[in-house]
Amino acid sequence: MWFDWILKRKNFLYLLKQIQIKNQQTLRPDFYSIVDVLGIVYFIIFYLIANSIARKNESNQLYKKYFVKGFYYKMIGSLGFYIIYAFYYRGGDSCTYFINGVVFNEYMLFQDFADGIRVIFSNITGVDNLPSWISNQSVYVYGEGYILRDTKALLVARISSLISLFCFNSYLVTCMAFGFLSYLAIFKLFSLFCRFYPSRVDGLSFAFLKVPSFIFWGSSVNKDTICVAMLCVLFYSFHKLFIEFKLYPKYLIALIISTYLVFSIKSYIVTSALPGLLMFAFVNYQNKVLSGALRRLFAPLMIAVGLLTFFLLYQSLSQTFTEFSEESLAVRAEGFKSDHMNIQERSGGSGYSLGDNIDYSPLTIVKKAPLALTIALFGPFPWQVRNVVMLLSSM
């Protein structure tokens, strides 16, 4: 029974692949094809699931008022991302993650099923540990195959392969699936914060569910979507385990998996979040145990403990992992800067400058922080607009 199902699925996927190949002369089949019409079907499926969740929690006003609306925003974000990257940019990191995920699926379904499972689920550390068929196909479908040489990007491609397998290798549907799955995690953390601040629900709903850039970058096949979703799971499961003391295996498993994925993709996020989590736990404990006067005395101590924890953690990681060393961070910062400047010169993107010959010492970082945060949060600025996409981003 299961063998027949797998065989039929392989035949159907093969048929879809042939349809994509036939459209190769008029379309870019790696990014969009006739298979994307399944997006309508998947939207209905995701809507029915979202509506079912809202009905199941109809006694909760948050789900009743915000859940389905937030779902619509996410789907709009996924569609917008798909349109811009598939039709305007015609590529990018997101498309590359997706393409290599499709290659993994094709290898598993049509070349070597057992080894394909190994490739997708094992901790691959580089292109040398991949089958030559995958390496050759990846180089063919996208430039130099650089994703396969980056362990973090390779993990994103493997996650994409798992999701795109159930989306019939459609980039549109895979973006929608990423957006929907991340939305479930985001709404969990949103509901938790609303318990902390019941008088600020409207503001929290805007921050979690309605900020355009947050929706756009968190609704597609990319690192940000995975990290945001897993960070929400990390915070939520941490609260359940260490604040509410609900010591259930599901929360422990969720905490371990989310921490692993975030640390593997963007390790600095875990480094930054850990002191905040510890302070959050300490504050909750002190509110339960100490009186008002003692709490006021205890607060500065907690801030000092949090800062000390961050400093010690950073020092430890910089010695253990070379990517946290000052030299490595400086090289990466210069790399990001030069990449953005190249994009600005080559394709009319927005660049930035924090000054020349920056030494990246702690004092310099503190001095440059206001300008860097302003650029990160509010750029590109209206006077930097060079095309329609930049105009939308600026708005």
Regions found by a protein language model. Name each.
Residues 29, 130-177, 378-387:
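Juxtamembrane segments of multi-pass membrane glycosylation machinery
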Residues 49-54, 160-162, 174-196:
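Transmembrane-helix motifs of polytopic, lipid-linked glycan transferases
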Residues 75, 205-211:
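Transmembrane and membrane-interface helices of multi-pass
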Residues 85-100, 109-137, 147-159, 366-370, ...:
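Extracytoplasmic catalytic/substrate-binding loops of multi-pass membrane glycan-assembly enzymes
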Residues 194-197, 234-250:
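Membrane-interface transmembrane helices that cradle and orient dolichyl/undecaprenyl
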Residues 215-216, 250-270:
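Membrane-interface alpha helices of multi-pass inner-membrane proteins
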Residues 220-223:
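Short acidic/glycine- and proline-prone juxtamembrane loop motifs at membrane-interface regions
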